[in-house]
């Protein structure tokens, strides 16, 4: 589900200004999705002939049941706004992190970073929400298949070009991946992985 104009313009601008400022801490990671041989065997990641993974920078807001960032308060209201937008509530935050991919003008058009799922759990109650902090190139590819399908190959469902203020909401066991920007200097997203409660309030 694509959600346009997810938050007010002033909130969008604040997030972009803070997260792209010199004061915001980013941490280098050599892969977009760390994996082992076991992850390949279980289907947590999926590699194909078009996989060319690039480094990225991370900022973890929340993990292992606790906030891990002084900036957690900046993004926490987005969870409540998401609940209002989709008419669902969330009982648990699995992980919230930001990813920054920097420009790579040599990156081939049809390539992509590692295809992965956001949680290895087969529990359907886990949901992912990707929020685009800035407008850029570097599409997000979302596939039709889930880890439960145990696919031999994947088919693309949607290609989503990052647009500031827009979000994508989908099941956390759906395969997806990013691509680095080739024309813009940076591509910044916030990735929420949340556990949905059984009953909604619509």
Regions found by a protein language model. Name each.
Residues 68-190, 194-202:
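Catalytic core of non-heme Fe(II) oxygenases with the double-stranded beta-helix
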Residues 1-90:
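Non-heme Fe(II)/2-oxoglutarate
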């Amino acid at each position: 589900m694509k959600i346009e104009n997810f938050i007010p313009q002033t909130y969008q601008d604040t997030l972009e200004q803070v997260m792209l400022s010199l004061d915001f801490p980013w941490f280098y990671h050599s892969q977009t999705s760390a994996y082992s041989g076991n992850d390949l065997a279980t289907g947590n990641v999926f590699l194909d002939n078009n996989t060319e993974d690039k480094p990225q920078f991370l900022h973890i807001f929340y993990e292992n049941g606790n906030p891990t960032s002084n900036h957690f308060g900046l993004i926490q209201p987005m969870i409540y706004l998401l609940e209002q937008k989709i008419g669902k509530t969330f009982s648990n935050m699995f992980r919230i992190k930001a990813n920054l991919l920097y420009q790579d003008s040599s990156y081939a058009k049809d390539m992509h970073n590692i295809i992965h799922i956001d949680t290895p759990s087969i529990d359907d109650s886990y949901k992912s929400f990707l929020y685009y902090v800035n407008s850029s190139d570097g599409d997000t590819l979302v596939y039709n298949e889930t880890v439960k399908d145990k696919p031999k190959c994947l088919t693309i469902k949607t290609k989503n070009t990052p647009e500031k203020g827009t979000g994508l909401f989908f099941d956390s066991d759906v395969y997806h991946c990013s691509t680095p920007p080739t024309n813009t200097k940076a591509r910044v997203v916030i990735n929420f992985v949340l556990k949905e409660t059984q009953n909604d309030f619509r």
